[in-house]
Structure formats: structure tokens, C-alpha cells
């Protein structure tokens, strides 16, 4: 029998349609068309079947473990494709599908509802594959179709109106399955038995070391027992020696100890827990069991951790690209569920708690799978376990722990004792989480009076996490909360001049700069402000879609590489969504547009620079009101523990002021003012348009008329709208300001405007211009570096 069924939807019997001989678009132009006698195909329609309730093939409803109460209903059964009618007070069940009726021993069930009778003389089975145009056939599709069973031929019969998202998802699923089958482009041999054997042992024999030279990494191999695969991956990435946290934690983790690790930002904590998990993955001979589960507080950090581990794992193993898998919100949950069903996928999971809990609730069958893990990791654990952030994680631990106790053994080993737990962060101090604008600085603990700080934090964490044994505490940065490679500085200004001094810093010290703001509106406004000044800037914040965040990060990295070659600045403006864990190479400066709300946020913000062995600069832009309040408390918390005499060091002298040049600031002031007005106009216009669209859409959904007077009666909406309208500019005024700003941008900046001649003064401007030396943006100014300036080296 012949059916016109798409290969990707052959399981959906609703897509079955009679084959039509007049569909020219399904027949190849390069092949001869063979006519099919219309009378040779006869459609035999099925009839309605009336049955009793006991004769139906009911399916039981499984109660998921994620539901504490199911309303008292248990033992429920359900069935699809059955109509219910009441005739003369009697209930009748009517179905058209014999599958819904229980089979009798002597009955033979038909496979399809529509049966075609064919005339062998008029129809040739081999030529029915011609229904698809050769221009639409993709590479390898014909060979894949030829491997199907002889009794079925899959030919697409989807109508043009039915194409779209469904066909797109099916094509994506097909490509994903091809990637899972062979990422390295392996050749399938005729001996299917040998092929299956190789696939089943793919992790146990991951590298052919006969043709590979062993990497020379003595500092790694002498201090810890690592496999050839990991050493080769580290060598390819250029990691010739371990960092302090890696040197102390990896040997203990390989032995199965629980670890609580504290290290400064950029010190390699990801590989400190990632390498032991990869070693477990290499030694494990199974192909479906999940080995490790890693939780991160943000989506961007989860994708970054996944990328780092994949670079170590896949450098020598071109296998399944989904072996190390990230599960985060903002991306298609259906795609993530589909990938988890592939063989060998999800051996190591990197997830955010919210999306992971959602997956467990949607598919309870995943709970026993992830309950078999060997290692649980909490990256940036202090953030995950703060009050208000722990509810989702607590539910996950409860579900996995309950399922783990039910399982008796894994490969003959008892599983009730729990899993290995590793928690890492750069901040483990309870004082760091206090709000700087609400806590009195007098009650903060003094420097040097907290010798057992890590023990206190551990006792706090053990109330929330059930460790199978007490963790080993590893603190590689006990004296400093902010790494010593970060040089801190301060700019004091009026609250309305923050934009001006951001612009000054960028022009004076061009490079790759990351600017942090406390509010999303400030991120949007500052991004528009810098774009008006012709500066390459990008933004990421929590209101953006996840794909847009990742896209902006990629654009920022690409643009920074281009601008660094010509000495131009590249700016990334972010809310605190990017403060933790993100490892963006080349960040020279971190600007705090607003003072952070807590000390731990400041530490993680500053840690986006000075990654690895590099040094960086962290600059706070602070108003006078902040200086006497939050700034004082921040410096009190961050003061060095083991200072020889901490009371004699005033908090005002703890952070040096950034040197400013008033003549340069005065030249930038007018530019900044105009750019700020244009940015306010742009943001207000977009916001008003968005509000109007939202109100219209809400009125349409409620089927009511939108009354403008009702909006005026609402004082909050009216005040907000008036505030935005006051920031808007007329079209002519907007054009005039843009023209004025462009003219100002064409004028070069000069170090000293009082000079009448190029060759006058201490600096020969003519010589500087001819020889192309000196500052790229300021004529007569030497090239300056913020790091060297703060180190004490004077530049003219």
C-alpha cells in the first residue's frame, strides 16, 4: 500500500492523505511521469463504532512526583479519539479508530483508517518516490529513504499552508539527530554489528593514543592524576599550569571529597570542578547515565561554563555535541526535551534552577535519571543559596533526593548515601550580602575579627544542603575580597554628571570597557547616549530576550577585536545580570555607573576584569550623597583583614581618586549635554509608543473601547506620561541638535586650548601630528593607560 506521508511525521496518522496524480510540483522534471489510473485507487472509508466503556482501550494516568496533591483523584484513566453521546438517557462511546477498542484474540486489527487498493499493472512502486521535486531533495535524503523498510515509502504530502514552524522544527530535529549520530563524520560500514559495538563503547575508547604524542604538562601531571584526553585538551587551550584553586581542589575532588572552595574572580574555578567531572565521564562505560549536574545563578554563566567544558572535552573527542548540555530559560523548552531523549546526550548538565525544575515538572521520568548523578556542583553558590533564591533549588534537591533513596543501586553500588557536592564562589561572607543603603556601618564587623568566617558560612549552608560528609574548606584568597590584580579608583561628581564622566573616561582611556548600572532604564539611556557620540556600545539586561543577549555579547566581542587594532573604544553596558561569572576576554576597565547595592555585587562586578594573570581597573562614579553613606559602608566591609593597623587607615584614603584634566572635561561638556537630550528623546518616544501599543492590545483582548479620559484619571499613569512627554523633542529641534552634535564631533580635542601655535608650549603639536604619535583622540596628549596611571606612573 502507498501513502503520501512525510518522513518526519510518519507517526502522525492524521497526516495520511490519498496520493494525487495531478500534483506536478511533487514530480521531478528530470524524470518521466507515469500516469496512474484514477480507478485503480479506491478509498475504503471506515464507519463509526459504538462500544461500551469496558470495551475501550483505556490508558492509565500517571501521577507525577512533582505534585504534592492531585485533588484526591487516583487511578485515573484516559483515552483519545472517542466521542460521547447521550441517547435516550444512555451514554454511548463512539470511535472511528479500532485501536481504541480492546483486541479479541481472534481479531486482526487494521493498521490504517484509509485503505488504498492498487492496480499492479498501472502503478510501479519504485517510481512513486518521484513525488518530491529534485530541487527540494537535500543531500543524503535519498540514501536515507532507500534504507527504509520495503513495505513503506515516505513521500511528503504537506500542503503549502501547513508548512512553517512544524516543518522547521522537523528539519531541525532531523539535523540534530544527524549531529548526535556522528559529530566527527564517521563512515558507516556494512557490518552493522561492528558499528553498534563501536557506538556502545564510544566513551570507553575515546582516543586512539597510538597516533598522538603525549602532551608535556609537568605541572598538571605531577600534581594530579589526569587522563590523556584532559591533558590534551588543556594543552590545546594553552593552560600549561594549574591555578592555586585548581591545584588544591582537583586532587581532593578526584578522590570523592566534598569541597567548599573560595577563590578570587578569574582564578579558574570552572575547571576546578569541571575537570573532575570530565574524568568521571571518561571512566564511565555507560552511554546514557548522567554524571554531573552543575547549577549557575544566571543563563549567561551557564552557557559560558558549557562552552569551557566542551573545549576541554571535545578537543580530542569529536563525538556527541550534546554530551555536555546547557538547560536555561529563554530558549525553547521543547527543543531541550527533544535533545535529552537522544542517546548519549546530557551526560553533564549545566542548568539554571528555574528551567531545570520546569523540565522535571513537565517530565517526571527525568527525575530518576538525574537522581543517579555522581557529582552536584553549585557555581556562585552564595547567590544560589541567598534567601529568596533558594526555593526552586530546594525543590530540586527534594525531588532528586527522594528518587535517589528509592533506587537501590547503580552498578551494584548503594546510592542512598548521597552524591559528591562541590560549591564554589568568590564571596562567602555573610556581611557582603547586607544592603549598603540600609545597614548601619557601626554594626559591621571590624577587619581581622572574623577568623572563622568560612566556618560560619559553612554552618549556614549545611542547614540548606544535606552533605554526605563535611566539606573540605579551600580558601585561596583569605586576606583580600577583591583580587589584588584589580586596581580600584574613584570619580566624584554630581548626580546629573555621570554621563559626562563616563564619556571622559572612555575618551581618555580608550579600550574595552564594561559599564554596570543598577537600573535597566539607565542601561538603555547610556547606550543611546554613547551611540549618539559615535562610540561602539552594546547593552545586555534582564528584560532582553535570551537570544538577543547572546547575540549582543557576540557582537561586542567581534567589535572589540576590530577596535583594539585601531585604538578605538568598545563599550558593553550591562545590569547585574552580567556581574557574575562571565569571562569576556580583553576587558581592561570596569566602570560602576551606580554604586552597587551590596558588597558582593561590587566584588563580582570588579572581577570581570583582571582575568587569569592579567591586571585591570575598577572605577566607581560616586555622588556626594553616596560618598558619605553606601561608599563608606562598602569600604568598611572590603577592608583588608590582616592590615597591620586598620584603625589608622581612613576609608577615604582606601581608594585613590582618578586624576582628571579639567580642560578636557570642559570640551566634552557641551557634547555630553546634547547627546543626553537626544538620548532622553529617543527613550521617551519608544516608551510612549510601547505603552500605547500595550493599552490598545489589552483593550482588544478584553473587547472594550479605549477611553483616553480613563488614563488621565489615573494619577500614576498621567504623571508618568507627562514626564515622558516633557523629554520629547520636536522634529525640527531634534534635527538641529543632531546637526550641532555632529559639528562638535568633527572638532578635534586639544590638551591645551590656550596655545596659539602648533609648535608652542612644552609639546610640539606639529611633530606629534606628522609622526602619528600621541593620543588617538586628544591632540597634544600622550598616550595614557588607566592601569599605569593608578600604579603611579605619571603621563603628560
From Swiss-Prot:
Keyword RNA-binding carried by entry: yes
Chain intervals with Basic residues compositional bias: 29-39
Protein's name in the database: ATP-dependent RNA helicase MAK5
Extent of motif Q motif: 219-247
Organism: Kluyveromyces lactis (strain ATCC 8585 / CBS 2359 / DSM 70799 / NBRC 1267 / NRRL Y-1140 / WM37) (Yeast)
Any Pfam family the entry gives: Helicase_C
PANTHER family in alphabetical order: ATP-DEPENDENT RNA HELICASE DBPA, ATP-DEPENDENT RNA HELICASE RHLE-RELATED
Compositional bias (Acidic residues): 158-173
Enzyme class: hydrolase
Gene Ontology MF terms: ATP binding; ATP hydrolysis activity; RNA binding; RNA helicase activity
Region spans: Disordered: 1-39, 142-197
Gene Ontology biological process: rRNA processing
A Gene Ontology term for the protein's cellular component: cytosol
Amino acid at each position: 500500500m502507498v501513502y503520501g506521508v512525510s518522513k518526519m511525521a510518519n507517526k502522525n496518522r492524521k497526516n495520511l492523505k490519498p496520493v494525487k496524480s495531478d500534483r506536478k510540483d511533487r514530480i521531478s522534471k528530470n524524470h518521466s511521469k507515469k500516469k496512474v489510473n484514477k480507478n485503480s485507487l479506491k478509498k475504503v472509508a471506515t464507519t463509526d463504532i459504538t462500544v461500551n466503556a469496558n470495551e475501550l482501550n483505556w490508558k492509565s494516568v500517571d501521577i507525577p512526583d512533582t505534585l504534592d496533591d492531585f485533588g484526591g483523584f487516583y487511578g485515573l484513566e484516559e483515552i483519545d479519539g472517542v466521542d460521547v453521546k447521550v441517547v435516550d438517557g444512555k451514554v454511548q462511546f463512539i470511535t472511528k479508530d479500532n485501536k481504541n477498542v480492546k483486541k479479541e484474540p481472534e481479531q486482526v486489527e487494521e493498521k490504517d483508517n484509509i485503505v488504498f487498493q492498487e492496480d499492479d499493472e498501472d502503478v510501479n512502486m519504485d517510481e512513486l518516490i518521484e513525488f518530491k521535486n529534485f530541487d527540494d531533495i537535500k543531500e543524503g535524503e535519498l540514501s536515507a529513504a532507500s534504507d527504509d523498510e520495503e513495505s513503506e515509502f515516505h513521500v511528503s504530502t504537506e500542503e503549502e499552508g501547513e508548512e512553517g514552524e512544524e516543518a522547521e522544527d522537523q528539519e531541525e530535529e532531523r539535523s540534530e539527530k544527524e549531529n548526535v549520530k556522528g559529530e566527527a563524520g564517521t563512515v558507516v560500514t556494512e557490518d552493522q554489528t561492528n558499528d553498534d559495538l563501536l557506538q556502545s563503547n564510544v566513551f570507553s575508547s575515546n582516543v586512539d593514543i597510538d597516533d598522538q604524542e603525549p602532551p608535556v604538562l609537568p605541572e598538571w601531571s605531577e600534581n594530579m592524576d589526569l587522563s590523556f584526553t584532559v591533558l590534551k585538551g588543556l594543552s590545546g587551550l594553552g593552560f600549561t599550569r594549574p591555578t592555586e584553586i585548581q591545584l588544591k581542589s582537583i586532587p581532593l575532588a578526584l578522590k570523592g571529597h566534598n569541597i567548599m572552595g573560595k577563590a578570587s574572580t578569574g582564578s579558574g574555578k570552572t575547571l576546578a570542578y569541571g575537570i573532575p567531572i570530565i574524568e568521571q565521564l571518561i571512566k564511565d562505560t555507560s552511554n546514557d547515565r548522567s554524571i554531573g549536574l552543575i547549577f549557575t545563578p544566571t543563563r549567561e554563566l551557564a552557557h559560558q561554563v558549557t562552552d569551557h567544558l566542551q573545549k576541554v572535552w571535545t578537543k580530542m573527542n569529536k563525538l556527541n555535541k550534546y554530551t555536555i548540555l546547557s538547560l536555561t530559560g529563554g530558549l525553547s523548552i521543547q527543543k531541550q526535551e527533544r535533545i535529552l531523549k537522544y542517546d548519549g546526550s546530557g551526560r553533564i548538565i549545566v542548568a539554571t534552577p528555574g528551567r531545570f525544575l520546569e523540565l522535571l515538572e513537565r517530565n517526571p521520568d527525568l527525575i530518576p535519571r538525574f537522581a543517579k548523578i555522581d557529582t552536584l556542583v553549585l557555581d556562585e553558590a552564595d547567590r544560589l543559596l541567598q534567601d529568596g533564591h533558594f526555593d526552586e533549588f530546594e525543590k530540586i534537591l527534594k525531588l532528586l533526593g527522594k528518587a535517589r533513596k528509592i533506587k537501590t543501586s547503580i552498578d551494584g553500588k548503594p546510592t542512598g548515601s548521597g552524591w559528591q557536592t562541590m560549591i564554589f564562589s568568590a564571596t562567602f561572607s555573610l556581611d557582603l550580602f547586607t544592603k549598603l543603603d540600609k545597614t548601619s556601618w557601626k554594626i559591621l564587623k571590624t577587619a581581622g575579627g572574623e577568623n572563622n568566617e568560612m566556618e560560619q558560612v559553612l554552618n549556614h549552608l549545611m542547614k540548606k544542603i544535606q552533605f554526605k560528609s563535611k566539606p573540605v574548606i579551600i580558601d585561596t584568597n583569605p586576606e583580600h575580597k577583591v583580587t589584588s590584580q584589580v586596581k580600584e579608583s574613584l570619580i566624584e561628581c554630581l548626580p546629573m554628571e555621570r554621563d559626562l564622566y563616563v564619556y571622559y573616561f572612555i575618551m581618555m582611556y580608550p579600550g574595552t570597557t564594561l559599564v554596570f548600572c543598577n537600573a535597566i532604564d539607565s542601561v538603555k539611556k547610556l547606550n543611546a547616549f554613547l551611540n549618539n557620540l559615535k562610540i561602539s556600545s552594546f547593552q545586555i539586561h534582564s528584560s532582553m530576550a535570551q537570544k538577543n543577549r547572546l547575540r549582543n555579547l557576540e557582537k561586542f566581542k567581534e567589535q572589540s577585536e576590530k577596535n583594539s587594532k585601531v585604538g578605538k573604544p568598545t563599550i558593553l553596558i550591562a545590569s547585574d545580570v552580567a556581574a557574575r561569572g562571565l569571562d569576556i576576554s580583553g576587558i581592561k576597565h570596569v566602570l560602576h555607573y551606580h554604586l552597587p547595592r551590596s558588597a558582593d555585587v561590587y566584588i563580582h562586578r570588579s572581577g570581570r576584569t583582571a582575568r587569569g594573570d592579567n591586571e585591570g581597573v575598577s572605577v566607581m562614579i560616586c555622588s556626594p550623597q553616596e560618598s558619605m553613606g553606601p561608599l563608606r559602608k562598602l569600604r568598611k566591609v572590603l577592608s583588608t583583614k590582616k592590615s597591620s593597623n586598620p584603625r589608622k587607615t581612613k576609608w577615604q584614603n582606601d581608594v585613590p581618586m582618578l586624576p582628571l584634566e579639567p580642560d578636557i572635561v570642559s570640551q566634552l561638556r557641551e557634547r555630553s549635554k546634547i547627546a543626553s537630550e537626544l538620548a532622553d528623546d529617543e527613550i521617551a518616544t519608544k516608551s510612549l509608543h510601547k505603552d500605547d501599543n500595550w493599552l490598545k492590545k489589552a483593550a482588544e483582548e478584553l473587547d472594550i473601547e479605549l477611553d483616553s479620559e480613563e488614563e488621565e484619571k489615573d494619577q500614576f499613569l498621567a504623571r508618568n506620561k507627562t514626564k515622558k512627554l516633557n523629554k520629547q523633542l520636536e522634529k525640527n529641534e531634534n534635527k538641529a541638535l543632531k546637526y550641532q552634535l555632529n559639528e562638535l564631533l568633527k572638532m578635534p580635542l586639544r590638551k591645551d586650548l590656550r596655545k596659539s601655535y602648533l609648535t608652542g608650549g612644552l609639546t610640539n603639536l606639529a611633530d606629534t601630528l606628522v609622526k602619528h604619535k600621541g593620543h588617538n583622540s586628544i591632540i597634544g596628549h600622550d598616550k595614557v593607560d588607566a592601569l599605569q596611571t593608578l600604579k603611579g606612573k605619571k603621563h603628560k
